[in-house]
Amino acid sequence: MMLKRKYGNRADWKRVIKRKYAQTYLDNGEYKGYITLLNTIKVTEPLSVRYGEKSVCIVDDGYMWLQQFPNNKNHSVTTMFDAGGNIVQWYIDICLCNGIDNDIPWMDDLFLDIVLLPTGEIIEKDADELEDALLKGIIDKPLYDLVWNEVKTLKGLIRKGSFDLIKWSHSHKGILSNRLK
């Protein structure tokens, strides 16, 4: 089974020409897992994504991406901050697992993603990629079902205001901001 492994330091991201990065392992009673922070000091060009009529700039000079890799969970959250420190979106990857390799946190991506905008709007992304992966035998039916169950659970938590990872975006960013190198 070939899933795409995504690393927290995003070392292969060509768009980012000057960067700072920090990571740490947290175990504070509330959260257990790695957190990473990438500061895109200089980029070749800004990157915007479209959601219907909306265009959201997710990376530009001075942006920060906080990624949370909670232990024993089937998701990882990337909070994207603009240069003023405002959250532009939360990007929730559904994943097989989170891990660490050569001291860099990673997650094995399971195709389907949830985007949460500061307005509260929830967008499901890449359902077609998930269907395709099932048809091609990249994932099996139990894994396919795990993804949809995870999405349903997370959307329920978000709607109730009890998905804690998004509440901790600012505090987790604060922990790493002064460690950026």
Model-identified regions with their sequence ranges:
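Conserved, surface-exposed functional patches that form binding/active-site neighborhoods
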Residues: 84-137
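A short, hydrophobic/aromatic-rich structural module that often spans a beta strand
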Residues: 90, 142-144, 175-181
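The feature represents the first ordered module of a protein
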Residues: 52-101
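Charge-rich, low-complexity N-terminal segments
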Residues: 1-64
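Short, surface-exposed, low-complexity cationic segments
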Residues: 129-153
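Cysteine/selenocysteine-centered motifs that mediate thiol-based redox chemistry or coordinate metal-sulfur cofactors
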Residues: 150-181
